[in-house]
Amino acid sequence: MATSFTKNGDEYLWLRDKNFESTDRPRCGIPILFPNCGKPDDGVHHFGGTAYPIEVHGFADLVPWQVKSADDSAIELTLTPNGLTKFVYPFDFALTMRYTLTGSTATLALTVANTGDKALPFSVGFHPYFAASKLENVAFDINAATCSENAKGEQPAAPETITLTRKEGSADSIRLMTGVKSPMRLSDSGSGHKVAVAFDESVFTNAVLWQQDAESFVCMEPWNGWANSVNEEGRHIELNPGESKEFKWSVTIE
């Protein structure tokens, strides 16, 4: 998981120290979401008639990865099944995560390979926490087909200007978007930060804006599924045995 991205000594990612030092699900940096984005209905996936409990956003950041290679501008890590993953996700797979830094752009590429003998169902997303002076100072430049606070049911058309505001009585602020065009941008009038998130629109079809508890961050997240997608036919990715697929996106400090 990426934990820092700086330019001229200025930090653009947000790190929650207590959370990062604990064994809890990471809620800072740039978590990897696999094999699900969000929390499925009743907190379970159904495979072959059996219900498997799964964490919010899956397990990719709850288990150790192995460093495959590293140099001054890139690092590559791998993850294969273990006892924990088999308990919640009864499939064979290989994940390869490559981080590459070029100037003011960090490129993140996740390759998912099906190493088993049956179809591999999953969704993928990323959850970057960008440092923010406060939510009211952050403006977004995002072109999307739909935008709502709930992924279920008919989705309303997105407004010309998408905003993220705190709902009275709620600790969370969220926008769920489909048909999102690349890139998405945010600018913070308080800190002067400007960030662009670019991605392959055929791979990352959805996106999420999220903020919680008036903390000093805002999330602008590329996803290709929703919370219950892995349980819904036609709403998740399936790789046949021997197949692989790359999910690449980038963050640029502007």
Label each PLM-derived region with a short phrase.
Residues A119-P121, P128-S202:
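Active-site/ligand-binding surface loops and adjacent short beta/alpha elements
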Residues L110-G116, Q211:
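Asparagine-centered strand-capping/turn motif at beta-strand->loop junctions
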Residues M1-P31, P35-C37, D42-V44, A51-I54, ...:
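Beta-strand-rich N-terminal accessory domains
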Residues Y52, H57-S69, R166-R235, P241:
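Acidic/His-leaning functional-site neighborhoods
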Residues T50-G103:
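Extended, loop-rich substrate-binding clefts of extracytoplasmic carbohydrate-active enzymes
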Residues L101, V112-N114, V251:
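Hydrophobic beta-strand positions in extracellular immunoglobulin-like domains
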Residues S4-T6, K118-V124:
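Short, hydrophobic/aromatic beta-strand segments
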Residues P90-A94, L101-T107, D117-P121, E215, ...:
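Coil-to-beta-strand transition motifs
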